[in-house]
């Protein structure tokens, strides 16, 4: 299976929402004290606005048929000049997901490599990622 990484488009909304829902349900199962099962992280309109915003690039991994099998939600952040730090940009990975049926096929690695190259191409100092545990 050949995988293509590209910016998310309107045609990717449904599958991205489905993957977001799967991630939310996993989080709700593990941390019901924080996450609410059966809800959504974004509405369709909110997700479209995120797709359209250059400060919040979303990249998708698509298979040969164009089906989205993973995503990386990113946020461009700028550290303004201060008395102790220079001005610089960073690309923050807010969310990364690979479809359960495609795990172990290096889709996540392809997404991460693409994000790193995008950060370099856009003058970012680094790429950051937070994890919960």
What are these regions (language model features)?
Residues 1-14, 22:
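Conserved N-terminal entry element of GNAT/NAT acetyltransferase domains
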Residues 8, 96-98, 131:
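Hydrophobic adenine-recognition pocket in adenosine-nucleotide-binding enzymes
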Residues 25-46:
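Conserved GNAT-fold acetyl-CoA-binding loop/helix
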Residues 45-60:
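A short helix-loop-beta-strand connector motif used in the catalytic cores of GNAT acetyltransferases and
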Residues 60, 67-76, 97:
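Conserved beta-strand in the GNAT
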Residues 84-100:
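Conserved acetyl-CoA binding element of GNAT-fold acetyltransferases
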Residues 98, 104-117:
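Conserved acetyl-CoA-binding loop-helix of GNAT-fold acetyltransferases
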Residues 119-131:
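Conserved GNAT acetyl-CoA-binding A-motif
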